Amino acid sequence: MRSVLGALSFVVPCVAQAAPDAGVPAVGLPAGPGSSQDQFQRYQQRQQQLDMLPPPNSDTEFLTTPRQSSPTKGCVDVKSLTIEGASHLSAATRAMLSARYTGRCLGVSDFNHALDDVNGAYMAQGHVTSRAYLPEQSLQSGHLRIVVVEGMLTGFQFEGISPRFHEAVAFPGLRDHILNLRDLEQGLDQMNRLPNWSAKMQIVPGGAPGTSAVRIRQPTPGYIHGQIWADNNGQYETGHEAGHAMLIAQDVLGLLDMWSVEYDHSLVGDAGRRGTQYISANGSIPFGKWTVFGGWWMSDDVYHLQTLGEDYRLGGRRKDFRFGVSRVVARNRIGVTTLQAFYELKSFNSTLDRVRLQTQSARQAYVVAQASESLKAWGGIWYMTLGMRFGVGAVGTHSAYDNPGEADPHTQYVKPTLDIDGYKPLPLGLLWHTSVHGEYSTRNQFTTDQLQLGGPYTVRGFLRQMLLGNDGIYIRNDVSWQFAHPGMNHGCGAYAGFCRLFVEGAELYGILDGGMTRAGYRSRALPPALKGGNIAGAGLGIRKTTGSIFWNANITHAIARGPLPHEGWIAAFQAGVRF
């Protein structure tokens, strides 16, 4: 049995295939942690966290630039200035505004500038309906009074949707308080985080002077949506083609809640000898600046390996549970800052001929803290997240390694992470989308926790092999050009319906990905693919991502293979329908 395990020592943990002369069986990625389903799960989890981030705020400039004016014949000497009713302006701001206009001879334009500056100070804080005015007064004493009417929010009106608890969860505590645009934007973001919502906001006059109401328009979005699709992003050993089905329930409790369930399965099996399946369930409920979220994922893989004249059944099961909260802590004209914290428990089980392999099976608990920034900068939209993942030795963790050495997998470590997603328009109607992920671990991890490079969800141009490492980074780049613009179906004549469903919104895109991994420790027994390396891939594709019917096809090729074997051209497809 020892010789069998030695031959399979690089396969059961689902590591990358080493160089062909390394003595490893000539197979691709096997079952268990590290399979394509594991990469798909990580991709989905990252995408879900990205979808939870609010979009960057408007870059509108609220503050007016102070203007210098010289004394004129029609001016009045102002020796002192008070701003009355400005309870939401700090004493320092009031003092700064007063100092700007005292000790000067002010004309009519200067008085208007003073009012603009007071209004601008309110608008900079989001109080867009508060107004400053000059009451009737005598300026013979040299004292100037500015009075502020702080605009109050009297209520909300919902059109197209039932009010239910929407005000309570999206705009808690705003009624009968000074109107703050930042809080309204936050509530609108909580509504529009639901995939099929596109709520619009309008501020309208209230029933009394100095008051306003907010009208929310949202065409009836429906409660249940879903999509079904197929692709060939799976492993050849466990099922290259896979089918996917997802159901999404939105606002079913009236709490702007969102729930989703997904089931995936390999489309081509082999009488139970090989196959893969994946199940996930996610949910989130907001409350003002807070959002509570959770998720559960499970995947199974099985395939058979022939080596040393014997047939062996390899199996793997992974489960992942996550629960946490996020909060928007800052919102201004630069961007939006969000903090997240969550607990995660991941378990993985590898078997050989249905016998559990203790050294390749474990439970790992984590505590994760993240800070994200959504902003408009450099001519584009950017989402940046810094995270810190702490592997803990309690609250669910179990491992066969009681006193792990440097080369053994650890359960207690610290792993900083970095994620960047950017969208930048380019000349000639091009759009550049870049995605960066990097991580560094202070200890060697189980392979299911290590960075995996090579595949449709990381560095494209690879499928059967990948790199693993405790440290590394990768970048994905798409440059797209939409050639079938919305409305083009009107030029299709009798085929207008076909064009609208299958062509409208289609785009060509180019692919350029790259990445690197490092083991993070030294060991003579490591195969090249586990020591680390640099890989890159490029390709071309055509896709349609909008509308009820979506599809994607691309062809990629490695341009830097590092220690990985040659795979040639890789063709990928995806097609599905939304409802």
Regions found by a protein language model. Name each.
Residues 286, 291-447:
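Transmembrane beta-strand segments of outer-membrane beta-barrel domains in Gram-negative
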